[in-house]
Amino acid sequence: MSDIALTVSILALVAVVGLFIGNVKFRGIGLGIGGVLFGGIIVGHFVSQAGMTLSSDMLHVIQEFGLILFVYTIGIQVGPGFFASLRVSGLRLNLFAVLIVIIGGLVTAILHKLFDIPLPVVLGIFSGAVTNTPALGAGQQILRDLGTPMEMVDQMGMSYAMAYPFGICGILFTMWMLRVIFRVNVETEAQQHESSRTNGGALIKTINIRVENPNLHDLAIKDVPILNGDKIICSRLKREETLKVPSPDTIIQLGDLLHLVGQPADLHNAQLVIGQEVDTSLSTKGTDLRVERVVVTNENVLGKRIRDLHFKERYDVVISRLNRAGVELVASGDISLQFGDILNLVGRPSAIDAVANVLGNAQQKLQQVQMLPVFIGIGLGVLLGSIPVFVPGFPAALKLGLAGGPLIMALILGRIGSIGKLYWFMPPSANLALRELGIVLFLSVVGLKSGGDFVNTLVNGEGLSWIGYGALITAVPLITVGILARMLAKMNYLTMCGMLAGSMTDPPALAFANNLHPTSGAPALSYATVYPLVMFLRIITPQLLAVLFWSIG
C-alpha cells in the first residue's frame, strides 16, 4: 500500500474510532467532536508501536485545510449576528466573556513564568483548557512562524489533549458550584428571565392602538413622524369593520385601530402620541387579507433596500418584520435584503403572490450551496491571514494566519451577505457538514501526531502536571467572572450559564445549561450573543501570548 493510501486509511480509522468515543455519553455529557482527538491518540499510539510511516506532507496539508474549513464555516454561520452582538443589547454579556478570556490569558502567563513551562506546551494547555480547537491551530502556526522545531510544535497537540477533558468537565462543575453558592432556584430564574424579555427592549412586539389624539385626525401616515420612521411598522388599519393595509398616503381618523410592530420602548412612545392600547383583534381571519412568510432567494433583489422596492405603493403589501439568521428585526426601509431573509408580508393574497415572485420564495434554493463564493471566501481569507504586520521589538511579524484570516473574512462576508449575484448564505445543513468535516480532519491529524508519546508523557512524564495547570486555566476565570456577574451585575443564573458556555465555545456545556430548564431559551440566547466575539479572541489570544513570551524570553 502506498504512503498516501495508508495515510488516508489511517485517518478514516481515526475518524471512526474518535466519533464513536465522542458519541459515548455519561449522564448526558460526552466529548462530542472532541472524541476524534482521543481516537487519533489511540490509533497514533498503535501506529507508532507498529513502526508505520505516514506521509508527513499529506498530514500537514490535511490538518491545515481542515482548520480552514472549520473556521471559515463558523464565520459564515455567525457573521450576520457578530456585529449585532457588539451593540448595547449584548454589550454587558460580551464584556464579561472578554474578561474570562483575559483572565485565562493572565493565568497562562503566570503559570508559564512560575513553572518555566515550555512555550508550545503552555499554549497547548491553554487551548485545551478552554476547549477551543482553532486556538490550537492558530498557536501551532505562530510557533512555526517563529521557527520552533516541528517536534516541539507537535507537543502542543499532546498538552492540548491532556487539558481538554477537564476543560469540558470544569465548566460544568463551575455552573453547579455557582448554583450551590448562590442557592439558585432555577424555576425562579427562568420566570425572571421571561419577565425581563417581555418588559425589555430586545424583542419585536405588536400592539393594537386606537387613534385618540385629535391632532392626528385627517393626517396621512407619512405626516405622523412616529409612524413614518424606521422604528415602527404600521401593518394593518381597521376602520369600523373594514381591515386594510395602510400605505404612507393613507389618511387616519379618530377611532381608527392601528396594528403596530416594533420594540416595546418604541411602541410605548407611540401610545403616548396616538392613544391607548385596545384588546380588539385585528386578525386577518375572515377578511380578504392574509399574513404570509416569504423567503428572499431572487438574486435580482439582493442588496436592495426595502423602500426602493416600493411594495406598499405597487402592491399594497406591507413587510411587518424581517428574520435574519434567527434574529427578528423591524422591517426598516433602510434594510438591504440578503439571501435567506424571511419576510412577514401582510396584504391581499394576489398581491402577496406577486411580491413573493419578486422576492423569489424558492425554498429549494435554500438547500443549494454556491461553491464559487465558498472558495472565493477561503482564498481571500488565506490571503488576509498571510499579510504580515511588523511590530517593533517583536521577533516575528504578526499574522492572522490560517485560523484568523479565513475567520475574519467569513465574518465580513457573512455580514455583507451578497455582492452582485454572489451570496455567502450557506444552508445550515451544508455549513454543519463542512464544519464537522473540517474539525474531524484537523483533530485526526493532531491526535495521530500526539499519540506516539502520549502514554509515556502521561505515565512517566509531566502529563499529570499539565492536567493540573489546565484545570487552573479553566476554573479560575470561570469562577471569578461567575461570582462577579452574579454579585455585581445581578445576572440571571441561566443567562450566566449560557455566557460561561459561550466564553469557552463549548457546545456540551450549552447542552448542560439548556437541560437546567428545558423550556427556557436564556442559556442559548446568551451563548449565541458572546460566541462570535469570543471565538475571534480565542484564535487571536494564543498568537499574542506566543509572540509576547517569545519576545521576553
Curated annotation (Swiss-Prot):
Give the transmembrane region(s). Answer: 4-24, 28-48, 65-85, 95-115, 158-178, 371-391, 393-413, 439-459, 464-484, 493-513, 533-553
Membrane topology term reads: Multi-pass membrane protein
Q: What are the alphabetically sorted keywords of the record?
A: Cell membrane, Membrane, Repeat, Transmembrane, Transmembrane helix, Transport
Predominantly, its location class is membrane
- Domain RCK C-terminal positions: 191-276, 279-361
InterPro entries xref list? AAE_transporter, RCK_C, RCK_C_sf, Transpt_YidE_put, YidE_YbjL
What is one GO cellular-component annotation here? plasma membrane
Q: Please name the PROSITE patterns in this protein's record.
A: RCK_C (PS51202)
User: What is the annotated localization of this protein?
Assistant: Cell membrane
The alphabetized list of GO BP terms reads: potassium ion transport
* Annotated GO MF terms: monoatomic cation transmembrane transporter activity
Give the record's family classification: Belongs to the AAE transporter (TC 2.A.81) family. YidE subfamily.
Checking NCBIfam families in the record gives:
PRK03818.1, YidE_YbjL_dupl
This chain belongs to which protein, by name?
Putative transport protein YidE
Q: What is the lineage of its organism?
A: Bacteria, Pseudomonadati, Pseudomonadota, Gammaproteobacteria, Enterobacterales
The gene that this protein is the product of is yidE
